[in-house]
Amino acid sequence: MKRPVTLTVNGARTTVEVEPRALLVHVLRDELNLTGTHIGCDTSQCGACTVIIDGYAVKSCTVLAVQAEGQPITTIEGMGSVDALHPLQQAFWEKHGLQCGFCTPGMIMTASDLLSHNPDPSEEEIRHALEGNYCRCTGYVNIVAAVKHAASLIREGARAGALA
C-alpha cells in the first residue's frame, strides 16, 4: 500500500506516493524524473547512484525513500546548470574526467562530499574517497586530477568571494 512521502530534493519540497519498500534511486528517477542519478548495479557496489543526503554521499540504491523523508537531498541536477556549471562539473570537463559519462554523476557527488569536508585533499585522500565508485573507461587518473582541480577552483572562488 502506497503512502505519501515528502522529500526535499535540490531545494524543492515535493510529496510523492510510494510503496514503503521503494528505493530512493527509483523514486528519484521514476517519480521525480531526475535521471542523472544512475542505476548501475542495484547492489551498492558501483556508486553510480550516489546522491548527497544531509551533507553526506550516500548510495541511493541502499536507502528507502521513506528513510530520506525530512532530510535535504542533492542530486547531480542540483549541482549546477547548463549556464553555470558547478566547479566539479567544470573540472571534470576541463581535465577530461569522463568518457562514457555513466559513472560521472556518482563520482561528482562523492567528490562533492569529500570537498565539503576536506577542501584541499591529497591525491591519496581523493582516491580513498572514490573507492566505492567504479569507472570502466578512464582508469581514474583524470578523475583524480579533476577532483584536485575542482578543489583549487572552489578555494579560489571562496577567496574571491571573501575579497568582494
Describe the predicted segments one by one.
Residues M1-A164:
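Signature of N-terminal electron-transfer/Fe-S-associated modules in redox systems
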